[in-house]
Amino acid sequence: MWSRKSAMLGSMAVAMYLLGLTLRNSQLVTIAVVIFVFLTWAALFGGHADVASSGRRAEEWTGEEGVALGSVLAMRKLSGSRIFEDGELTVTLRMQNNSGLAKILEVRDRVPEVMRIKEGSNYILMELGPRRETYIEYTLECPLRGFYSIGPVAVRVQDPFGLFHKEKEMHVYNDFLVFPKMEDLKDTFVKSRVPKIFTGAVNIRQPGPGSEFYSLREYFEGDSFRAINWSAYARSGKLMVNERERDAVSDVIIIIDSRAVSETGPVSRNALVYSTRAAASLAKYFLGRRDSVGVVVYGDEVVSVDRDTGKKQLYVILTKLAGAVARGNIPLQVVVNRILPHINKGSPIIFLSNLEDDPTIVNALRDFRARDFDVTVLTPSSLEFEFDAKRLDRTGYEVMKTERDVLIGELRGLGVNIMDWEPDMLLSTALAGARGF
């Protein structure tokens, strides 16, 4: 590819050649021919013509293997593969020149558009000596959840005279996952007494798996040796085992609306962003109380995470939430009809939605209430996001706000605990308001 310098030289040579022919000046023609010869030599033998591109994804590398661009090698390392929103990711790009000649390189590492470079730079223009290497290090700030990939590496190799260059993309990629950030609900819940609503693991005064001591009994074949009470054995001369008081674990179902309408508003401030963060925070809280948590995300399809407990369940839920995309328009009634037969009676239901463009919401939540489910609805208002971004005028806002208030009042009349979640309101505040605290 011609650079600006080579284009100017070429244009000048053409002008001198034509002028020499017109004036019959052999000196101008000779100079023009010399320039043409020099440009031809630089283009063919200037040291940049060994460019070739091939590569593999980063997870296929072994050892110090990278992706080669002729005699130039690129390798990339990330400080982590899983981070939370607003977290930082350090990227180190290693460039090597394995040839015996110096290379003038222009390197740009492609990063996702939503990422912000907080420190350093993903671009460098340098002369890399023969059999030398250099490192490009920069820090990304990751404001939004999702699956992301860094790459490819765009490289421009110039000849020593700066006349020509060739550009190629080195197909080296690194994938990473950004989880939705979570709000710590532990202290806030205790202050607002919300945990009384969601009871968590409760002792029911029956023997079984649990943490609290229940009674002593004689050892039977098959009992765990860890359960043997050696002090009781020393006193009685019989093998005795400890029985624990069985814990009853509540099932909590979290439903997230990820239809196309949930992305109404700015990219970083919309109903889906708030809903995924709330779902992550609630899942962490309930799993910390040894509850069994299940998640349902619906948009163009219904994606569910079966109820389970423990840290592994939290990771599964966070991964599903990170991959939630706003698309489709499945009605809530379809979701309720599908999951209703599989939910234990009395399970708390938490529904996260902006309540827009779905005429089945009232009937769907009525079905839950008719079966005596405890339903809590947190509804991030897309109207507020649009109005704050000045995409909605005052008159339109007031009309749509009135319609929304009527819908919320109708749901309250069904016995649904509901809160209009304003953009600057903490999750703990919104949840306490929904529960009437």
Question: Which sequence ranges carry the predicted segments?
Answer:
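An amphipathic, basic-hydrophobic helix/alpha-beta surface used to engage anionic
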Residues: 36-308, 348-351, 367
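Exposed, interaction-prone extracellular/peripheral surfaces
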Residues: 4-7, 189, 198, 207, ...
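An extended acidic
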Residues: 1-64
